[in-house]
């Protein structure tokens, strides 16, 4: 590894303003999400996320990542196709 002098980073006013605007935007989104979750808890939907049921937890994860599992049948046509001789 080569030794070199540390690179100097300068914090500019534009950078600070950009950081503040992004932080405010993220805080607004977080508040909005908390408000939506607050409404869901009164309906009982929010409690499902806290339950220890592995099926519901797995389903929540699959929904979050967009995974839709397909059930596989165990017959030969599904494994090898429909071959006719």
Swiss-Prot record:
It is found in: Nucleus. The keyword Calcium does not apply. Residues 7-37 form a coiled coil. V-shaped homodimer. Interacts with CDC16. The mammalian APC/C is composed at least of 14 distinct subunits ANAPC1, ANAPC2, CDC27/APC3, ANAPC4, ANAPC5, CDC16/APC6, ANAPC7, CDC23/APC8, ANAPC10, ANAPC11, CDC26/APC12, ANAPC13, ANAPC15 and ANAPC16 that assemble into a complex of at least 19 chains with a combined molecular mass of around 1.2 MDa; APC/C interacts with FZR1 and FBXO5. Residues 26-36 have a biased composition (Basic and acidic residues). Residues 71-85 have a biased composition (Polar residues). GO terms for biological process: anaphase-promoting complex-dependent catabolic process; cell division; protein branched polyubiquitination; protein K11-linked ubiquitination; protein K48-linked ubiquitination. One of its GO terms (cellular component) is anaphase-promoting complex. The keyword tRNA processing does not apply. Component of the anaphase promoting complex/cyclosome (APC/C), a cell cycle-regulated E3 ubiquitin ligase that controls progression through mitosis and the G1 phase of the cell cycle. The APC/C complex acts by mediating ubiquitination and subsequent degradation of target proteins: it mainly mediates the formation of 'Lys-11'-linked polyubiquitin chains and, to a lower extent, the formation of 'Lys-48'- and 'Lys-63'-linked polyubiquitin chains. The APC/C complex catalyzes assembly of branched 'Lys-11'-/'Lys-48'-linked branched ubiquitin chains on target proteins. This is Anaphase-promoting complex subunit CDC26. It comes from Mus musculus (Mouse).
